[in-house]
């Protein structure tokens, strides 16, 4: 078998070679034709001592081949040993194959990093497919709070990750501006309007929004309308106050998001579904009714619910059970208005109508029970052509030195996103919000995230990038021609004798760099940007460990004054590390500093 050298995605390259071996065994009659190779994986082994990669090829093909897994593994391993990239192929356990690659693979992998620069790790698996990522979508009733922050960062990082993996991404915000909560907002703003005109409003009544952030809305209403709204009936002043309050709240929210470097391309108004001369909610219900998915009927009482909480009446129902939900769902309320669910169906149908077959929604922890009904609705309105993946982000517990943080006076009852960003910076917020899987509760300690220690992941990763540039600055005594520009520096170092990098710690870093493209693809396919954060921490940790090792063992230092060859090779390794750190941090929306201040 020829050896074309490692591809950008070394794991994909080896997987292709495993597939080629299986195809060769089919041609030889050792395997039957028609076997499904899609379940074969090539991945890092659980233990580093087991080699560089492992494959389950024999395990997943054995049944179809009517063979014992270990017997089939012997045939696959024998052919893999003849491959130019593979040094050893060993059978383990019930039939896994552990692979050790030849040393030059890792030096070639580093050259790939140097050659591709900030393009290294970028994938084409998305093939330009359109993906709609809807995130934040907070009610326009006040400033962003720390709970919104996690979903905002997660959604933004996921959108960047999918774009990096080759998808055509649209970032969308759904403005919930048609529910009862915006009427409460309007009444709260009207109270502040009266206050702006000099009236004593006393204590804010229970049920209205108490935060000081509504004072500017009241002042703006007073400046625009004088006292004319005081004499107007509620039917006249309510829509005026509502429109002004929503507009000013959305500007505030956009400003809060900008503090985290988050921007959306589309802001879609819920109210637009029923205004502007067409009722798209009614049209969607009619569309589903024509398909037989909407009917008039009665729901059985909820199990365990008190009788007084159940209203036995004829309702307009979506036949959600036909699409995997537990019960059919009401589309209209007792007063004749649409349920929120009905609006949600119509909204998601607009995504489909705009050409999105792949949708991702980022929701808060309190929406977990809503997933099945919306996924059922999307199956119905798209005839199964579109898919929705809902990512739930769990709660954030805001702490300072382990103690809960007190609420904000400005907001009334929560800590604002802006307060947190102003205190610790957007980098710390973004990285730490991603340094835990989205469906796990996150403890965010304001004191810990600004510590300069290895116990603070964002510092440790950014310090890895800064340490690399510190090494470059020190190296200019030996290499005064070492370029400042990253691409020119990579080209300068591309001719280094990187095969001289043979210490286990150096080889470990090379393997870690080679893992980056696979990590990107796996994270994108799973919609899990935290995998990038975890990877960056591991890469930075190995880099710091090698630096520390060189401090204790002079022959392993990055700069050896009397050995220009090994110094240049290690500078090439440093270039690879800082390049991948910068790439991964960019995906997460975090800066990669050249020095720590």
Curated annotation (Swiss-Prot):
Keyword Nucleotide-binding appears in the UniProt entry: yes
Location(s) in or outside the cell: Cytoplasm
Assigned keywords, A-Z: Aminoacyl-tRNA synthetase, ATP-binding, Cytoplasm, Ligase, Nucleotide-binding, Protein biosynthesis
NCBIfam families: argS
Matches recorded under SMART domains: Arg_tRNA_synt_N (SM01016), DALR_1 (SM00836)
Broad class of the protein's primary localization: cytoplasm
Subunit structure and binding partners: Monomer.
Domain of life, per lineage: Bacteria
Protein source organism: Nitrobacter hamburgensis (strain DSM 10229 / NCIMB 13809 / X14)
One Pfam match: Arg_tRNA_synt_N
Record motif 'HIGH' region, residues: 138-148
Gene Ontology molecular function, alphabetical: arginine-tRNA ligase activity; ATP binding
GO biological process: arginyl-tRNA aminoacylation
EC annotation from Swiss-Prot or TrEMBL: 6.1.1.19
Recorded family membership: Belongs to the class-I aminoacyl-tRNA synthetase family.
Reaction it catalyzes: tRNA(Arg) + L-arginine + ATP = L-arginyl-tRNA(Arg) + AMP + diphosphate
Matches recorded under PANTHER family: ARGININE--TRNA LIGASE, CYTOPLASMIC, ARGINYL-TRNA SYNTHETASE
InterPro entries registered for this protein in UniProt: aa-tRNA-synth_I_CS, Arg-tRNA-ligase, Arg-tRNA-synth_N, Arg-tRNA-synth_N_sf, ArgRS_core, DALR_anticod-bd, Rossmann-like_a/b/a_fold, tRNAsynth_Ia_anticodon-bd
Name this protein carries in UniProt: Arginine--tRNA ligase
Keyword ATP-binding: yes
């Amino acid at each position: 078998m020829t050896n074309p050298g490692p591809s950008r995605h070394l794991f994909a390259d080896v997987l292709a070679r495993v597939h080629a071996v299986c195809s060769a065994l089919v041609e030889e009659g050792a395997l039957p034709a028609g076997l499904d190779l899609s379940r074969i994986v090539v991945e890092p082994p659980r233990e580093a001592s087991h080699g560089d990669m492992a494959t389950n090829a024999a395990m997943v093909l054995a049944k179809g081949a009517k063979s014992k897994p270990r017997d089939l593994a012997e045939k696959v391993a024998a052919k893999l040993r003849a491959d130019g990239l593979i040094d050893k192929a060993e059978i383990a356990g019930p039939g896994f194959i552990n692979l050790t690659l030849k040393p030059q693979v890792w030096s070639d992998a580093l050259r790939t990093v140097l050659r591709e620069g900030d393009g290294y790790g970028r994938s084409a698996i998305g093939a330009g497919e359109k993906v709609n990522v809807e995130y934040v979508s907070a009610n326009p009733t006040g400033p962003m709070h720390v709970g919104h922050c996690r979903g905002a960062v997660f959604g933004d990082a996921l959108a960047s990750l999918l774009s990096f993996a080759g998808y055509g991404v649209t970032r969308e915000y759904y403005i919930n501006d048609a529910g009862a909560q915006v009427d409460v907002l309007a009444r709260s703003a009207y109270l502040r309007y009266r206050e702006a005109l000099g009236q004593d409003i006393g204590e804010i009544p229970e049920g209205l929004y108490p935060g000081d952030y509504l004072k500017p809305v009241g002042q703006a209403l007073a400046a625009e309308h004088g006292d004319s709204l005081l004499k107007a009936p509620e039917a006249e002043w309510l829509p005026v106050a509502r429109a002004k309050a929503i507009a000013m709240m959305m500007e505030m929210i956009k400003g809060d998001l900008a503090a985290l470097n988050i921007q959306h391309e589309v802001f879609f108004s819920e109210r637009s579904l029923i205004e502007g001369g067409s009722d798209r909610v009614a049209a969607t219900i009619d569309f589903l009714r024509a398909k037989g998915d909407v009917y008039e009927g009665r729901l059985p009482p909820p199990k365990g619910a008190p009788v007084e909480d159940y209203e036995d009446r004829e309702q307009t129902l979506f036949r959600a059970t036909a699409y995997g939900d537990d019960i059919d769902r009401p589309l209209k309320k007792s007063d004749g208005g649409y349920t929120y669910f009905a609006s949600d169906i119509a909204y998601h149908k607009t995504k489909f109508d705009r050409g999105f077959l792949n949708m991702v929604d980022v929701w808060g922890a309190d929406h977990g029970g809503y997933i099945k009904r919306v996924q059922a609705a999307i199956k119905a309105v798209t005839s199964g052509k579109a898919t929705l993946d809902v990512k739930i982000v769990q709660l954030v517990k805001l702490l300072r030195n382990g103690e809960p943080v007190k609420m904000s006076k400005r907001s009334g009852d929560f800590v604002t996103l802006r307060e947190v960003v102003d205190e610790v910076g957007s980098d710390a917020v973004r990285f730490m919000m991603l340094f835990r899987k989205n469906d796990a509760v996150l403890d965010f300690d304001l004191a810990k995230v600004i510590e300069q220690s290895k116990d603070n992941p964002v510092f440790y990763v950014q310090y890895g990038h800064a340490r690399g540039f510190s090494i470059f600055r020190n190296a200019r005594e030996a290499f005064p021609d070492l370029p400042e520009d990253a691409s020119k520096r990579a080209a300068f170092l591309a001719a280094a004798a990187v095969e001289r990098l043979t210490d286990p710690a150096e080889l470990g870093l090379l393997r870690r760099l080679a893992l980056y493209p696979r990590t990107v693809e796996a994270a994108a396919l799973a919609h899990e940007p935290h995998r990038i954060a975890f990877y960056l921490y591991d890469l930075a940790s190995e880099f710091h460990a090698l630096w520390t090792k060189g401090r204790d063992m002079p022959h392993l230092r990055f700069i050896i004054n009397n050995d220009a060859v090994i110094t240049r090779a290690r500078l090439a390794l440093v270039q690879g590390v800082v390049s991948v750190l910068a790439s991964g941090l960019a995906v997460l929306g975090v800066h990669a500093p050249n020095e720590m201040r």
